[in-house]
Amino acid sequence: GVQEKLGRLTANLELIKGTITRSEDNGHLDEFGIYTPSLQALQAVRSTLPEYYDEALRVTQHLAAGSIVGVPSFAEFDGDNATILNQALTTDRATAKTRTRLLNLAFDLTSSGFGQRQLMYEYYHGGDPMRIRAQHYQRADLQAGNQMIDRLLSADNANTHE
């Protein structure tokens, strides 16, 4: 449902915040006293942000549905249709003009040329996400995980019944 979709977006936001905090906590001071956050953590965010952004757009499209297609222009509120628009678009949570602004923003982000350019920016400005992920893997410190697997396999071999 709606809450599940919005919950995925808020969970993605918390993952981003947590990763940024980790990058700050695992950073270091260089010889000039300049603090640099952990690049490995930041690369993890960079590799997932385009997908998170795309998902946010899809959720917005789904929730706004047909409302974004027929949204009036702001000038129409000054014309003969103002009363009808106010009655039709006002909800218990937003005035007609506020709802129109929100729906116009949703349309701009999900369906206009501006929104599509922003999507391309999210995917490629920071670098090719596939390349970033490959570099992230190549730079990952997997030693602790590999040692844990080795211990589990050794324990399994010791307990194997043949």
For each of these PLM feature ranges, what is it?
Residues 1-28:
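Extended amphipathic alpha-helical segments enriched in small hydrophobics
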Residues 3-8, 36-43:
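Short, charged, amphipathic alpha-helical segments
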Residues 23-32, 70, 74-77:
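Active/binding-pocket-proximal capping segment
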Residues 40-161:
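Alpha-helix capping/hinge segments and adjacent helical runs
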